[in-house]
């Protein structure tokens, strides 16, 4: 019918005259979708100084982000059917961008008031970090789709094209943030930059729509611009626990008020290492003294060792070995280049032929080690909130065993709390690889009544456990040595961890029970 075709053509022409140019619609969809993914990744790093990076924090941030995307898209589509999208797209972009900026001071102020990293704190900070701005930005793409539709004949191509562009925006933002932005910019810069770019695009879209509609649509309330400005200003004054944001941690070095030359390396929420700048033989942490006791008992005094350290931290033990066993050759494998830089700049780490540092994943480093050359392999990469599971398995321990000499010793620091399922599972895994295994821990831990740091040791040869016990006492420790039947009773029927199944996040109890 000629009349109907002319009418449809007229409708399409009028729609196109008030819609966004195709390239602008693509940019808006790409940006709004990408900003949500930048927020998700940066939001995880933003809350890490207060609650750590664990399976729970990852789950909370991802879960809230997905929920916000779903709610935002649903509400954006519903509003687009009830209200002219041209009135809402620009304000939503500006509001979403302003809140991306504002979450930085909001999380920092909220985090500074928290006293623990319990599940409630994790959920609260994750929600503050992502929910509202992600929902607002996710409402934009369905509105753009509605605005660009000229006729039912184009629905499939318009929806498909803009949906694909939005997905590409999310993919690009994910790779850009994970591989580049995090490496070169602090979290604060990433969030403020992303938010302000989104605000500016929103303002530009508003100007364009006002021109195309004669001022009917595209107005941005001044209050939203003030929110973006206020958020940017507050971002500079909000309290931050970080001296440096590394690729993996919020890191800082704290001076010991009771020891002039003492320094503590704090990563996220935990004290990871203590270094005495003047005396490398001073060992503050009990677990480090326990590992030192193992080295004292398993090798003649002063004899140099060939040692591999999985996890660097403040490099306390390598420095100790260099001081008490001159000629020792230590290779430290540390995954975080930012931590290594802080070691060099603030903790006085000087690399020599006898103390080398390699930036790499410890599991990868283990796989590259030549066979049968190490007298000692030290596992010190396990934290109190999260565990690099790839270092806990039979396959990883087989690599450690391969690197050791025939009478070499593997020793590792573990952290767990009752019911101590992770420690039990790791001991069971060690026993699947090494015939001689022992546990060093306080009596209360061995009784299952308390938690904290423990030290495990293993070898293909029998261990001098009496000498280890004496060395513990020499290090002013009241820790006990558990082996044989006592260790059997402690381990029980704990599962052996493998690369195929290592549920360490579920086994680990990162916090002491209230009142314990």
Put a short name on every predicted segment.
Residues 137-140, 283-287:
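Phosphate/oxyanion-binding active-site loops and adjacent basic polyanion-contact surfaces
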Residues 195, 392, 425-426, 469-472:
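Composition- and surface-driven signal marking solvent-exposed, interaction-prone regions
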Residues 94, 282, 289-409, 418-422, ...:
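The AdoMet/dcAdoMet-binding core of the Class I SAM-like
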Residues 30-31, 278, 384-387, 413-414:
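Short, contiguous strand/loop micro-motifs
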Residues 215-274, 280-284, 297, 441-516:
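Soluble small-group transferase modules, centered on the S-adenosyl donor enzyme superfamily
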Residues 1-244, 255-259, 269-272, 303-304, ...:
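Alpha-helical transmembrane segments of multi-pass membrane proteins
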Residues 88, 134, 277, 281, ...:
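Short gly/ser-rich anion-binding loops that grip negatively charged ligand groups
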